[in-house]
Swiss-Prot record:
It is found in: Cytoplasm. Residues 64-142 are annotated as: Domain II. It comes from the Bacteria. InterPro entries: DNA_helicase_Holl-junc_RuvA_I, Hlx-hairpin-Hlx_DNA-bd_motif, NA-bd_OB-fold, RuvA, RuvA_2-like, RuvA_C, RuvA_C_sf. Keywords: Cytoplasm, DNA damage, DNA recombination, DNA repair, DNA-binding. The RuvA-RuvB-RuvC complex processes Holliday junction (HJ) DNA during genetic recombination and DNA repair, while the RuvA-RuvB complex plays an important role in the rescue of blocked DNA replication forks via replication fork reversal (RFR). RuvA specifically binds to HJ cruciform DNA, conferring on it an open structure. The RuvB hexamer acts as an ATP-dependent pump, pulling dsDNA into and through the RuvAB complex. HJ branch migration allows RuvC to scan DNA until it finds its consensus sequence, where it cleaves and resolves the cruciform DNA. It comes from Geobacillus thermodenitrificans (strain NG80-2). One of its GO terms (molecular function) is four-way junction DNA binding. The gene is ruvA. This is Holliday junction branch migration complex subunit RuvA. CDD domains: UBA_RuvA_C (cd14332). One of its GO terms (biological process) is DNA repair. Belongs to the RuvA family. Homotetramer. Forms an RuvA(8)-RuvB(12)-Holliday junction (HJ) complex. HJ DNA is sandwiched between 2 RuvA tetramers; dsDNA enters through RuvA and exits via RuvB. An RuvB hexamer assembles on each DNA strand where it exits the tetramer. Each RuvB hexamer is contacted by two RuvA subunits (via domain III) on 2 adjacent RuvB subunits; this complex drives branch migration. In the full resolvosome a probable DNA-RuvA(4)-RuvB(12)-RuvC(2) complex forms which resolves the HJ. Signal peptide: none annotated. The lineage of its organism: Bacteria, Bacillati, Bacillota, Bacilli, Bacillales.
Length: 194
């Protein structure tokens, strides 16, 4: 099992990142690849989960051990595979997910991509009482202040119905550019619709 990989972010796309570690590029699927955008110039530590089946050998990576451990727990639920686990982690915080499972809040769990009533019930059945280490809220990551135009563009995206979690994924990439509000919205929509 590979605990973590420390290296430089070589490539980022909507599904995965490539970490260059001593000249070897590791393709690592993550819930939010663009969260690694700010780490492009410095070495980054990616906590990994190695998924091996007869037809698949893949690495899944996370910013924290907590996220990685929750991903491993999600894979224990019947009906949730790696793609489903990543989608759930991309759409919510570990403490919110743990709280919903402990409180048997099926309606909240059904809001996650790919989770219907049957899967929500299975998550509660399989994970209730096993996620106490995730129930403490995680400290929010410090965010750099946004320009007025970017803040207006984000408000427009929210008005169009995009979830805050989806928008947070693309903010680091948008921050690198200086544009008008309209240009930010167009660029963001292009990124979100990929």
């Amino acid at each position: 099992m590979i605990e973590f990989i420390r290296g430089y972010v070589d490539y980022i796309c909507p599904e995965y990142i490539v970490i260059d570690h001593n000249g070897i590029g590791y393709e690592i699927f993550t819930p939010n690849p663009f969260a690694f955008e700010e780490s492009r110039e410095a070495a980054v530590t990616v906590y990994t989960y190695e998924y091996v089946r007869e037809d698949v050998h893949a690495l899944y990576g996370f910013l924290t051990r907590e996220e990685r451990n929750l991903f491993a727990k999600l894979l224990q639920v019947s009906g949730i595979g790696p793609k489903g686990g990543l989608a759930i982690l991309a759409a919510g915080r570990p403490d919110e997910l743990a709280r919903a499972i402990e409180e048997e809040n099926e309606a909240f769990l059904c809001k996650f991509p790919g989770v219907g009533k049957k899967t929500a019930r299975q998550m509660i059945l399989d994970l209730k009482g096993k996620l106490t280490m995730f129930s403490m809220p995680t400290a929010p990551r410090p965010a750099a202040s946004l320009s007025g135009e970017l803040a207006e563009a984000i408000a427009a995206l929210k008005a169009l119905g995009y979830a805050e979690r989806e928008i947070e994924k693309i903010i680091p990439a948008l921050r690198e550019e200086t544009m008008s509000t309209e240009q930010y919205v167009k660029r963001a929509l292009a990124m979100l619709l990929k």
